[in-house]
Structure formats: structure tokens, C-alpha cells
């Protein structure tokens, strides 16, 4: 079994096959998702105290906060797919 990993900033890595969505944290529904995850204990804060710029939702319902832009995470994810095909 080959696990693909994606760097989400500051040396933090997430399994690419577990990512369901990468979204911006500005909207009210996403803020609610973050708060509910915090209350349930399924929030992973990988921002190192910096501003949250991307919210990654995993298939296990875990919510991961990243200080890297959503576009950057998506580009890293898609570049992994390109490297696999070569």
C-alpha cells in the first residue's frame, strides 16, 4: 500500500488520500465546522500560532487548520498526482 503525503506547512504532513476538502476559513459555515470540531476534540491545529488560511477536512471527519493558502495545498496535492503518472 502506497501512501501519498502532502506538506501542509511547517513540516506538517497529511495523507493525501484522506483529504475530502480544502477550504478557506472565512465563511460562517466553515467557522461553525471548526468550532464544532474543537468541541468534539477532532480539530488538529497545524498553524504554529499563525493565522489560519486553509481548513482541510479529512474523511475521518477530522478538521485540520493550516497556515498555508488553500491554493498552495491544492497545488502540492496535484503535483503529487503528476509525479505519480511519470
Swiss-Prot record:
InterPro entries: RemA-like
Superkingdom of the source species: Bacteria
UniProt record similarity statement: Belongs to the RemA family.
Entry-linked PANTHER family: REGULATORY PROTEIN SSL2874-RELATED (PTHR38449:SF1), REGULATORY PROTEIN TM_1690-RELATED (PTHR38449)
HAMAP family tied to this protein: RemA (MF_01503)
Name this polypeptide is given: Putative regulatory protein Swol_1238
Organism of origin: Syntrophomonas wolfei subsp. wolfei (strain DSM 2245B / Goettingen)
Species classification: Bacteria, Bacillati, Bacillota, Clostridia, Eubacteriales
Amino acid at each position: 500500500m502506497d501512501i501519498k503525503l502532502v506538506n501542509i506547512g511547517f513540516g506538517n504532513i497529511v495523507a493525501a488520500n484522506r483529504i475530502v476538502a480544502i477550504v478557506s476559513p472565512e465563511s460562517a459555515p466553515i467557522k461553525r465546522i471548526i468550532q464544532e470540531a474543537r468541541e468534539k476534540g477532532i480539530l488538529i491545529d497545524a498553524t504554529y500560532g499563525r493565522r489560519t488560511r486553509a481548513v482541510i477536512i479529512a474523511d475521518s471527519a477530522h478538521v485540520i487548520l493550516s497556515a498555508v493558502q488553500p491554493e498552495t495545498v491544492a497545488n502540492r496535492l496535484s503535483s503529487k498526482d503528476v509525479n505519480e503518472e511519470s
